Amino acid sequence: MKPTNEDTVEISRTVALWAHIMDDHALDRLGECLTEDAVWDGSVFGGDPVVGLDAIAAFMNAPGHAKAHHTTNIVVSEGPGDEVRARSKGLSLLEGGGVATVVYDDDLRRTDDGWRISRRVIHLTWPQRF
């Protein structure tokens, strides 16, 4: 689907909202940016992709996640069928003062509540390994 300008604004807001929800520890609000059946693929950090809002919330609530998230450089593009793609960059501040940078590749679907991320794949760009 080719996104309209209005779609692009809403999708950019949805992608950026992820960082606010994470940093506010408002995991009960994940449904504002993810679909019920969302896939969070952070396998670059080890482990398997996590599927579904409840499982993603539990995973994000576990120790070891970044303390601050900053989403930038959001680019929205056409996706297959009813989907739209977004690519953004993330800067995360880690416990102990470290920094990590990532690229997020998102698939988004329009729901009754607006655009939501149905799949997020994370690519670590710095450091090279965790």
Q: What does each of the following model-derived ranges do?
A:
Residues 1-24, 28, 32, 36:
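Short, low-complexity N-terminal intrinsically disordered segments enriched in polar/charged residues
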Residues 2-3, 15, 41, 61, ...:
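Residue-level detector of alpha-helix boundaries and kinks
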Residues 4-7, 45, 49, 97:
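Alpha-helix initiation/capping motif
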Residues 27-88:
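A solvent-exposed, acidic/Ser-Thr-rich amphipathic alpha-helical stretch
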Residues 61-130:
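A beta-strand edge to alpha-helix "cap/lid" segment located at domain peripheries
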